[in-house]
């Protein structure tokens, strides 16, 4: 009779549960089984665990659920040694919830999934009672390293902002945060044995020896993390199953350090005439023993602060040409039998790796660091330059993080007219989502050495964003972060972009609740038979503006017009927004003939004629001084609705007139001042007359570089 009862219960359970498509959980779990009934979360419920290790996690979940944590309760967190690391089992029953994990990370992953089953307000202020459909979830990640790198050097990002971003990563099961703490622009971590590194090196501009870059040209600006700050970030992230990995970028990208300690540089005197005495060298001399003494102090303190296994020591974009001019480096190369400076870099990295080993740490490096010779076998290599470099690292036997820029650099543009870089690629979420190691050409043996994926956000273009774009970090990284989370978690050699897009749209309500100012896909704009319309499929509201009358409103119905180019559309929902969408005529630009002249001599190869051809940069042969000017004179006066005249690179404000003003001439003879430059450029909106010439005048000495870049003008016609 007892056996019959057990069988009946088993049949009932099988009838009560069924495998169905998961309810838009990102990343997608291995198995989601829907069951009959629901769990009703009440204020009287408790998150419970008997494990001291899991109590911080119980408190974390209880805070999100608006309940208390205790050793007994209705939502139970447990360790299960039969499960692997980060593996979990989640059971939602009518009377209780059980989350079991193979370790702390596994239980956390179950908690993150459980939160995605609750109403979206769980991420801000969950109202009780709340219901969750009964279900069973079995899940584990494909890769143990699911990372994101945040550059806090080019743009200072506060401790509080980092911790807020940690939450966003944790909600999506990203488990590594690499902080890019040192670079040419700043030194962000307190080193108590050398306090000047952060106290001076954390700031640039003003009376700082570090030249201003990427914005904030006229003020001393920045900050740094005390060791107490960093320990607070580490502890906060640890509760959320995120390991914080520091990067101290060596031996290159060290201009900030060199600005404070020029003695670290190679033993030769460069020509500084073109930079008004500012030394732009950025690489540690590899031959000076005093440098290794300084770095030993730094490494010791970094290892004491961070509890991670790996310390990233850089190795990218080292200007080894400086070593070729250094008598000490050349002598060391001869002594060691080296013929290439890349071998000297490997020597440098091995010495730093030996220091790390003394403190029980292992080195992590950028892919260039393995080009010049063998590094320790336990080195973790981050392949950023391309797929080829990732495959080479794995083939050499190094554990490898796959992060080629054309798929994983989230500072890249998402379409050609949006802000960001474009040197690696222009891509949105779909390109990242499409990545599999098989599709990238990794062999079975190479795949064995891939331990995960990482995306990155280098922040050069962040500091100069205008106030209305203060959420640039969110916009650039979401929803691309959802793609990263998915491919780093799910074991699959095929991708269904349409299905995942539908998952993302369902997930947008959660991004809204998290307060993420993510990027929406632009509305689809159609003009047929004199009727202009716009469509969106993501639940957003579409807004339309007539750029001639400057009247904007919510788009509700198609527009009958003979001038479709006068209308521009954007989509918004919550804090999210899309790029502009319009018929192609709206984006059309003019390319009138012009002559470029300057008080500064032109570069020998990047001549002024390059800019006159449009689409290419010109350069001067020296940096700028007070009173220097650049003039654009048009063959015929240009009538337009907008004209942008800019110094600097196309994608970010570097090699610019840091301070200055613009003058306009309508007759080619008389110039009038129209305003100050912003980040090296001036934009003329609706000029009252056709423009014959524009002149940019510099009002500050130098720009931290050896030249000024000059862009061709961008000119929009009247509509």
Set out the residue ranges of the language-model regions.
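Flexible, acidic glycine-rich loops studded with aromatic residues
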Residues: 363-368, 375-379, 385-533
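Feature activates predominantly on carbohydrate-active enzymes
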Residues: 83-310, 351, 355, 454-461
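Short beta-strand-plus-loop segments that form exposed binding edges in beta-rich domains
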Residues: 696-704
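Bacterial Sec-dependent N-terminal signal peptides
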Residues: 1-24
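Disordered, acidic Ser/Thr/Pro-rich linker "stalks" and the adjacent N-terminal cap
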Residues: 583-640, 646-659, 676, 707, ...
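Low-complexity, disordered linker/stalk regions enriched in Pro/Thr/Ser/Gly
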Residues: 502-619
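Active-site neighborhood of glycoside hydrolase catalytic domains
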Residues: 257, 262, 275, 281-377, ...
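Acidic, contiguous N-terminal accessory segments
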Residues: 19-141, 364-370, 509-513, 600-601
